[in-house]
């Protein structure tokens, strides 16, 4: 399946991140059963990463690149675009489809 992007709120419609650019996002990650496993919002600290550098799961590299600044969307990531058969011990079971509520705050 890869990553499915489901819009929640529109962005500026013109500023999309490109490979090599640093992005700042707020996110909440949930498992299929709705269990929240991580949230930058809960920490009140946005998360930064560079698009296309493999710093995050593939679903984020490809999904966040489809968002414009200010946009909020659900990124539904199949296991091969998330943590795969390994999962993330103690947090994410193996072969989990993950849903992230992501808001793109800034592109640098």
From Swiss-Prot:
This protein's UniProt keywords: Cytoplasm, Isomerase, Rotamase
A GO cellular component annotation in the UniProt record: sarcoplasmic reticulum membrane
The reaction(s) this protein catalyses: [protein]-peptidylproline (omega=180) = [protein]-peptidylproline (omega=0)
Pfam families xref list: FKBP_C
Keyword S-adenosyl-L-methionine listed: no
Disordered: annotated span: 1-21
EC identifiers of the protein: 5.2.1.8
Family: Belongs to the FKBP-type PPIase family. FKBP1 subfamily.
Source organism superkingdom: Eukaryota
Main location: cytoplasm
Gene3D superfamilies: 3.10.50.40
PPIase FKBP-type domain residues: 20-108
Matching PROSITE patterns: FKBP_PPIASE
Protein's name according to its UniProt entry: Peptidyl-prolyl cis-trans isomerase Fkbp12
GO molecular function annotation: peptidyl-prolyl cis-trans isomerase activity; type I transforming growth factor beta receptor binding
PANTHER family according to UniProt: FK506-BINDING PROTEIN 59-RELATED, PEPTIDYL-PROLYL CIS-TRANS ISOMERASE
Location in or out of the cell: Cytoplasm
Metal-binding is among the record's keywords: no
SUPFAM superfamilies: FKBP-like
Known function: PPIases accelerate the folding of proteins. It catalyzes the cis-trans isomerization of proline imidic peptide bonds in oligopeptides. Binds to ligand-free TGF beta type I receptor, from which it is released upon a ligand-induced, type II receptor mediated phosphorylation of the type I receptor. Binding is inhibitory to the signaling pathways of the TGF beta family ligands.
